[in-house]
Regions:
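N-terminal mature-domain "stem" immediately C-terminal to a signal peptide or N-terminal signal-anchor/transmembrane
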Residues: 26-73
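PDZ/PDZ-like domain segments forming the peptide/carboxylate-binding groove
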Residues: 54, 70-71, 92, 111-122, ...
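Cleft-lining beta-strand/loop regions that shape enzyme active-site pockets
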Residues: 23-26, 48-56, 215-221, 236-258, ...
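Well-structured core secondary-structure elements of compact alpha/beta domains
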Residues: 146-156, 160-206, 271, 298, ...
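Hydrophobic membrane-insertion alpha-helices, especially the h-region
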Residues: 7-19
Length: 487
């Protein structure tokens, strides 16, 4: 068993990310036993290591209950009132179940929800098989906070029919407006209302097929992760549980890189399709794949029998395709223009350029300004010496100084945070030395994070741009530089 705790700036305070890797050989393969052990581990970590431990009582239990129900069916699309009545028997017992590693409540909700989802999947297609009558006046309540759960399946069907009718109507209005405009321009023939209504229904059917396909690939553990997060977020909004798969995505997002072929995938009509070729990646460099190509099978060597992936969960198919830099993967591809062929790809480190700092020059009649946009405070947690926000900001500042700028603008708009260490380092580029931020840990211990380097990289005019989506690390950097009268 391997356990890691991550302290990470994401939204104004230091957040606790709990990540567990549990070896399949360390205990019984029974899923229920695994869930119980995981609940026990999470509870222990929160109790011993969280900055602000909570009292696990009936009030806590009620909040977890409300949070979990809202997380799984906030729009009242699946569950019935009778289900909620059954669930409510546990509303003030979840605290006891947490303390005893009991998952009876979760099991009940999980089984009931999946049953209801199957029922909806079986009847929504009937609703969309026939045209809607838009001449009939109907009302629908879209305020999900005040909307009640359906009394029974018939009422749920009515609710779905109205929502689908509204969705088709929205699509109809949009498609009709587009068609009329294209007709005026002479690029398209004018379509009948019946044709446009059919197109709108077909679009909704395709969207719902994708939704239920995605849902069918969710495993019990995915739902249990939602339950765990309903518990841990009661400690504070910035405490999260990350399953191994989510942790991998988290690392990719915060580092801005991953090892693989350099393509994004989606699942459509039971097939794995290339949705984007990432600039700079192996596929892009050698022009090996195109958007719309379908991956039929994957092999790790020329001699290996390819594994069909059409019926796989998308994340499982992705795991087969990704791999360490320098290794090869062999994909059986159905080309978007037709034809099937095998493509050999050498995996490499793929950098997501949209993650990284970028600079540009702004000029007016009298001055030249440097603008640096920083989307997030990225870092490789396994190796700070690798590319990170601070090292890239330093390079951009040096580059802009060579262009003899008169002032510098650091754009942190929409930057939701990231690595605290990079914040301290970046602050140091603009001040001689001194404290940047104070971190208070469990037990009341206070740590002052300082810039100890007396050198200043940029001592000229400095402007920091922030907006309502600038959070956490962005707020710390902006506040520190303001306190030092540097911005």
């Amino acid at each position: 068993m391997f356990l890691r705790i991550f302290g990470f700036i994401v939204s104004g305070v230091i957040s606790l990310f709990i990540y567990f890797e549990v070896s399949n050989t360390s205990f019984s393969s029974n899923e229920s036993n695994k869930d119980k052990l995981l609940l026990d581990l999470v509870s222990y970590v929160l109790d011993k290591l969280h900055y602000d431990p909570q009292i696990i009582n009936d009030d806590f239990s009620a909040k977890v209950y409300d949070n979990f129900i809202d997380a799984i069916d906030s729009q009242k699309r699946f569950l019935l009132k009778s289900d909620l009545k059954l669930f409510s028997e546990y509303k003030y017992l979840i605290d006891d179940q947490i303390n005893s590693s009991d998952i009876t409540f979760f099991n009940l909700v999980y089984e009931t929800l999946n049953k209801r989802i199957d029922e909806v999947e079986n009847f929504y297609q009937e609703v969309l098989e026939v045209p809607f009558n838009f001449n009939t006046n109907e009302e629908i309540n879209l305020d999900y906070d005040v909307l009640s759960f359906a009394e029974n399946i018939n009422e749920l069907k009515t609710l779905w029919r109205k929502r689908l009718k509204l969705s088709v109507l929205d699509g109809f209005a949009s498609k009709k407006e587009t068609n009329e405009k294209e007709n005026e321009e002479g690029t398209k023939e004018l379509k009948s209302d019946q044709e446009i209504e059919l197109e709108s229904r077909e679009s909704i059917i395709e969207n719902l097929e994708d939704f239920f396909q995605f849902n069918s690939e969710l495993e019990r553990f995915d739902w249990f992760s939602i339950y765990l997060n309903s518990i841990v977020t009661q400690f504070d909004p910035h405490t999260s549980y990350l399953a191994p798969e989510a942790k991998e995505v988290f690392d990719q997002n915060i580092s801005g890189k991953f090892q693989g072929i350099g393509a994004r995938l989606l699942k459509r009509n039971q097939q794995v399709e290339i949705s984007e070729v990432i600039i700079g990646g192996p596929v892009w460099r050698d022009n090996l794949l195109n958007v719309g190509d379908i991956i039929l099978a994957v092999a790790q060597s020329k001699d290996e029998e390819p594994t069909e992936i059409s019926l796989m969960k998308l994340s499982d198919a992705t795991d087969l395709i990704k791999g360490e830099k320098g290794t090869n993967v062999y994909l059986t591809i159905k080309r978007v223009e037709g034809g099937i062929e095998e493509v050999e790809i050498t995996r490499d480190i793929v950098e997501l350029e949209e993650t990284y700092a970028k600079s540009s020059i702004i000029k007016d009649d009298f001055n030249t300004f440097g603008l640096i946009n920083l989307p997030r405070f990225y870092v490789d947690f396994d190796d700070y010496g690798e590319r990170n926000a601070a090292s890239d900001i330093k390079k951009e500042i040096l580059s802009l100084k060579e262009k003899e700028i008169n002032g510098l603008i650091l754009d942190l708009r929409n930057n939701g945070g990231g690595s605290l260490k990079t914040v301290v380092d970046i602050t140091g580029f603009f001040i001689e030395k001194g404290p940047v931020v104070q971190v208070k840990s469990i037990g009341g211990r206070k740590d002052i994070l300082k810039d100890n380097d007396p050198s200043i990289l940029w001592d000229g005019p400095l402007v920091i741009l922030v907006n309502e989506f600038s959070a956490s690390a962005s707020e710390i950097l902006a506040a520190a530089l303001q306190d030092y009268n540097r911005a």
